[in-house]
A protein has these predicted regions:
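Active-site phosphate-binding strand-loop segment of PLP-dependent enzymes
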Residues: 16, 22-75, 79
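Short Gly/Ser/Thr- and Asp/Glu-enriched loop/turn motifs at secondary-structure junctions
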Residues: 181-187
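Substrate-binding/gating loop at the entrance of the active-site cleft, primarily
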Residues: 1-13
């Protein structure tokens, strides 16, 4: 997500983008504190722009090797077939899972996102949210978000259609000589042979 860089620069927070491997995948060991000291970690799962999912065991290994910093898993595309990291919240107090209604709930313009974490971490976020949140929500946005969350049938139907279309597109792209990793998002990151 391009705003991570923008916010880090705005608040003068030093950051580093760790490159993906030759298959456009995250290498968990590159995120281990003993190999790469850091003040916190943020990564998308599934990855953007590749759509590749990082397994829960790989996410857990990152958490195990970074017990003293916050690890944020951005799950903007998780509803399109990836596994959420939420089950790891019971075991790791330093995990924060963030999601959005922009993708699978079709509310991109509303700018509704949310964080899932332990009570202490959410309390810290609530303490600063009005100081740093450039996307405050008005009554219309709140009503749209609540309606989207309640409309489970539309959500399931939309996600199913996107996933079916993605799988069909993969088959058609293969016929045309394209190759790609297994996308678990609503897009395909393809290269031509």
């Amino acid at each position: 997500y391009s705003f991570y860089d923008v916010w880090a620069e705005e608040f003068r927070i030093p950051y580093e983008q760790i490159p993906l491997d030759e298959n456009f995948c995250i290498v968990p060991e590159q995120y281990f504190a003993e190999n790469h000291p850091n003040g916190g970690i943020v990564f998308p799962n599934p990855n953007a722009p590749t759509g590749v999912e990082l397994s829960l065991s790989a996410i857990e290994s990152i958490l195990q090797h970074n017990p003293d910093v916050v690890v944020i898993v951005d799950e903007a595309y998780v509803d399109f077939g990836a596994a959420t990291a939420q089950p790891l919240l019971e075991k790791y107090e330093n995990l924060l899972v963030v999601q959005t209604t922009s993708k699978s709930r079709s509310l991109a313009g509303m700018r509704i996102g949310y964080a899932i974490g332990n009570e202490k971490m959410i309390s810290y976020l609530n303490d600063v949210k009005y100081s740093f949140n450039s996307y405050t929500m008005n009554q219309t946005t709140i009503a749209a978000g609540a309606a989207a969350i309640r409309d489970v049938e539309y959500f399931r139907k939309t996600v199913k259609k996107v996933m079916e279309t993605r799988e069909w597109s993969k088959e058609e792209l293969k016929k045309l000589g394209f190759s790609f990793e297994d996308s678990k998002s609503n897009f395909i990151f393809a290269t031509h042979k």
